[in-house]
Amino acid sequence: QKGTEGRPDIKEMTLDDIVRVKNDFVNAAKLSKEWGYDGVQLHGAHGYLLCEFLSDLNQRTDEYGGGILQKGQIIVDLVEEIRTVCGEEFLISVRLSPELFSLNTEDVYVFAQHLLKHGQIDLLDWSLWDVDKTIDGTTILSNVLTLDYFGCPVSVAGKIDSAEKVSVLFDEGIDMVSIGRGAILHHDFPKACLASGFTVRELPVTADSLYTEGLSKVFVDYMRRWKGFVLD
């Protein structure tokens, strides 16, 4: 995408670039199936490439830019092409986030509904950053649950730190949860959070505590980039 202020080195992808990237995604899915994986997830959040297509950074004027459905066409294309190559039994998940990274919240909901109606995905995974966060008095969680999922399972992520919170999410209609921070801080998080009195470690944490949980030095160094996570 072009249009990012202050980065003259950024150029808009050509249509040939997009075809090449789509082929790479599809080939990765094909290899995953050959290696015994049950499915793949297309990551359309956190500022990654597919997220940039959905965001306001996308200033394209061709079929991959303009309205939100055009911006998201690359994701629809990928779902269809992976389904064709890998078959009906191969699981395809898409991760989206309704905010941050230059995303327009209402646009994301419109695209998500379009994707669900399309009927080709097996899971929609919402990265909410904080499942309890409210906007104008309404939780983001309740907003994503207003969509019609057409029977598609839904999962959420975002500061899920206890068995009690997981139980509440299930009661709200969530089918499964995605654990990030909790699993980084506790390698056995699902088992640990069932113990009476369990609480997730407060941030920041020491690098040694992360090594104890089995994280590599490379990953710990990566986590140092997250403000307030690793105590130096």
Predicted regions, residues:
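Flavin-dependent oxidoreductase catalytic cores
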Residues: 1-232
